[in-house]
Amino acid sequence: MVARSEEVEIVEDTAAKCLMLLSRVGECGGGGEKRVFRCKTCLKEFSSFQALGGHRASHKKLINSSDPSLLGSLSNKKTKTATSHPCPICGVEFPMGQALGGHMRRHRSEKASPGTLVTRSFLPETTTVTTLKKSSSGKRVACLDLDSMESLVNWKLELGRTIS
């Protein structure tokens, strides 16, 4: 009988020790120590990895803008990465694919059955969309004179009925 009570006592002690260890989860070994993240470029220290990531982005800025060879290589990279996304229906260009996706909703006919796509045949062949580019901000503006096109649009062909 004595052996049985000693065995229960050992199990209880072991369980208590495990619970004590589990209650310390999340504490650093020395107590109040915090983890520090250091920038490899300038050795500045940050309290979180996210803050370090934001700081590291600042090192990607142009260091010496007066070096012409460096500017030439950067402009070549910019033209390769800055792709435009033209609308396959009307030809308007967008800087981001997400903007093109939002624009494509305009080509969905609300009066026809849902999902009917208005195609290039909706516009006459002589219609051109003029795209102007602002040099200061890089945004593009499309100019389209809809009043002059009203008599040229073939509503019957596209929608299957005449709209008055």
Curated annotation (Swiss-Prot):
Q: Which GO terms describe its molecular function?
A: DNA-binding transcription factor activity; zinc ion binding
Biological process, per Gene Ontology: cellular response to hypoxia; regulation of DNA-templated transcription
- What is the protein name given in its UniProt record? Zinc finger protein ZAT8
Show which residues constitute the signal peptide.
Answer: none
Q: Report if keyword tRNA-binding is assigned.
A: no
Q: What induces it?
A: By heat stress.
Please state the gene responsible for encoding this protein.
ZAT8
GO cellular component, as recorded: nucleus
Q: What does this protein do?
A: Probable transcription factor that may be involved in stress responses.
The UniProt entry, under PANTHER family, shows: ZINC FINGER PROTEIN ZAT5 (PTHR26374), ZINC FINGER PROTEIN ZAT7-RELATED (PTHR26374:SF388)
Zinc-finger (C2H2-type) residue ranges come to 37-59, 85-107
Q: Mainly resides where?
A: nucleus
Q: Which PROSITE patterns match?
A: ZINC_FINGER_C2H2_1 (PS00028), ZINC_FINGER_C2H2_2 (PS50157)
Q: Which UniProt keywords apply?
A: Metal-binding, Nucleus, Repeat, Transcription, Transcription regulation, Zinc, Zinc-finger
Give the location in the cell. Answer: Nucleus
Task: Quote the InterPro entries the UniProt record gives.
Answer: Znf_C2H2_sf (IPR036236), Znf_C2H2_type (IPR013087)
Question: Is Zinc there in the keyword field?
Answer: yes
Q: SUPFAM superfamilies in the record, alphabetically?
A: beta-beta-alpha zinc fingers
Coiled-coil parts of chain: none
